[in-house]
Design a protein with these regions (language model features):
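Short Cys/His-rich Zn2+-coordinating modules
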Residues: 214-225, 251-257
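Histidine-centered nuclease catalytic patch
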Residues: 241-270, 279-292
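Hydrophobic/aromatic-lined pockets within catalytic cores
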Residues: 34, 38-41, 58, 230, ...
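C-terminal structured domain segments
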Residues: 289-366
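Short cysteine-rich loop/turn motifs with clustered Cys
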Residues: 221-250, 272
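Short, charged/polar micro-motifs that form catalytic or ligand-binding hotspots
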Residues: 15-23, 230, 258-262
Length: 370
């Protein structure tokens, strides 16, 4: 992706910010700068940028279980926050995370926030500083700041070192360039992040959907399909064996959406609102629930070929929720016996399930607390 040309600024150096990146800090640091600059702030403290970095990484680690790097301190501080504050949800709003980080008095968290600033504020702009090489980077922060502040035409410069209160000053010409071209710059940054994170998580699908907090998904078409089925035959949900009703119907992703990042019908099953909330983004125990899932799905499969109205509703659903013709043929074609249907569904779901399990999604069994 090509960044917009500028006669005044060296865009070639900007385009090299993430060359040879082995850890994720540069992406999150620059993303935080872009966020602040486009909001009209040019003087930024280390602390507000670090808080933004942690909030941006939070849901990637807690909700999506992404690996951000081999020794990633950003991932480590997110995990520490969850351990010390279990009340924080995995899909917590970024504003809540930032407020927590601003107000925390926890010495360990503050220390780890400071540790995030030891290198990235200085190293990010290394493409602009071709004269600074090798061991010249390995000096104290104050000396490094003095050296960097002598360089010409950087994106930002530093005020005196003062821990997390240290300020960077984004230069006005760079700020105007970022604001003017913010959509292209954000797209370029997103592309670079996707490439990096995909390399760290080669078996994880839908990385592009996991750079941002989870969004509200539209499963109304699937709900309508199951409501029609419920009006024709009783259906038991698979976790608590309750008979489903139209008034208490929720659509669950068997393998969590936060892993698969899609709404394909073969991974969707009807349950109750409270059970779906309880399950959250955990993995249902395979030995306990997969056969029940098969029986429920096979019931709907049989009705698909028994009732014209169900078939018609299924076809409407399939336009949005079955995006693979091979899978549609394998598990929805006419004439499948139960064992054949079960075998096909297992070959589709099990590899995805195992991959999610390997990424750290928690095994779950429903506990009826009545």
């Amino acid at each position: 992706m090509q960044l917009p040309y500028s006669e005044e600024l060296n865009i070639e150096y900007l385009g090299r910010l993430f060359d040879n990146t082995t850890e994720c800090y540069k992406f999150f640091w620059f993303k935080a700068i872009v966020t602040k600059v486009t909001a009209g702030k040019y003087e930024l403290t280390y602390e507000e940028l670090v808080d933004e970095m942690i909030a941006d990484a939070y849901f990637m680690v807690t909700e999506y279980h992404l690996n951000l790097g081999p020794k990633d301190a950003l991932e480590g501080i997110v995990n520490l926050i969850r351990i010390k504050n279990p009340a924080l949800k995995s899909c917590e709003k970024q504003s809540v995370i930032i407020d927590f980080l601003k107000n925390t008095q926890d010495k360990e968290i503050i220390s780890k926030k400071r540790a995030l600033t030891y290198n990235v504020p200085y190293r990010l702009q290394s493409p602009f500083m071709e004269n600074v090489k090798g061991k010249e980077w390995n000096v104290g922060e104050s000396r490094l700041i003095a050296k960097i502040n002598q360089e010409n035409r950087l994106i930002y410069y530093f005020e005196a070192l003062n821990g997390l209160s240290t300020k960077i000053i984004v230069q006005s010409d760079w700020a105007q360039y970022i604001i003017k071209n913010q959509e292209i710059i954000k797209g370029w940054l997103e592309y670079k992040m996707i490439t990096y994170i995909q390399k760290r998580n080669p078996s994880v699908p839908g990385i592009a959907d996991k750079l941002y907090p989870p969004y509200e998904r539209n499963l109304e078409r699937v709900k309508k399909y199951w409501r029609l089925i419920l009006s024709l035959e009783p259906v038991h949900e698979i976790y608590g064996d309750n008979i489903l009703t139209e008034n208490d119907l929720s659509i669950d992703h068997f393998v969590p959406w936060s892993y698969v990042a899609h709404d394909e019908m073969w991974n969707l099953n009807p349950t109750t609102k409270s059970i779906n909330s309880s399950k959250s983004n955990n993995l249902p125990d395979w030995n306990t629930y997969f056969e029940k899932l098969v029986r429920q799905e096979y019931q709907s499969y049989q009705m698909l070929w028994k009732y014209d109205a169900v078939h018609k509703e299924f076809d409407k659903c399939a336009k949005e929720h079955i995006n693979n013709d091979d899978i549609r043929y394998r598990i929805y074609r006419k004439g499948l016996e139960f064992t054949e249907f079960a075998g096909e569904l297992e070959t589709i779901i099990l590899p995805v399930y195992q991959s999610a399990k390997n990424c750290g999604f928690t095994n779950w069994k429903y506990q009826n607390v009545r």
